[in-house]
Regions:
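N-terminal intrinsically disordered, cationic/polar leader segments
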Residues: 1-136
Length: 136
């Protein structure tokens, strides 16, 4: 499990990997958060539940990262923990463990939007990998 952040013109490209689809999605969300906040080992103050409509893995990735952007922009919270599970219908359910945005030092600009440019989700041997570009 892990992620890598790569500069991409005026954007940010996130590559994530894990042994499961859900793990890969969670790693991408962690990667997005680490691009703008120094989460370290900060404990969550509370949880925020989310759901994503059923769809193929690339669309679930966009929906999940859109949820991160929403929580940051609309609620001024930063996810420090991500829990993701697939629903029987093929969607997602989960929780973000969050803290107030002001409680963590910024390390970069907050994301503005998740794009579908260069969006990829694929199986690579025993692991799942994804790539997504985020407008910062």
């Amino acid at each position: 499990m892990g992620f890598e952040l790569l500069p991409h013109t005026a954007d940010l490209k996130i590559t994530a990997w894990s042994s499961t689809v859900e793990g890969c999605l969670a790693e991408a969300a962690r990667g997005l958060v680490s691009s703008f906040a120094d989460v370290g080992d900060a404990p969550s103050a509370r949880t925020v539940a989310f759901t994503c409509e059923p769809g193929p893995a690339p669309e679930l990735l966009v929906e999940l990262l859109d949820e991160v952007v929403f929580v940051v922009d609309a609620e001024d919270l930063i996810p420090v923990r991500v829990s993701v599970a697939r629903t029987d219908a093929g969607g997602l359910t989960g929780e973000f463990g969050v803290v107030e945005r002001a409680s963590l030092p910024p390390v970069g600009p907050a994301p503005k939007a998740v794009t579908r440019h260069d969006l990829r989700f694929w199986r690579a041997g025993a692991s799942w990998r994804c790539e997504v570009v985020v407008d910062v």
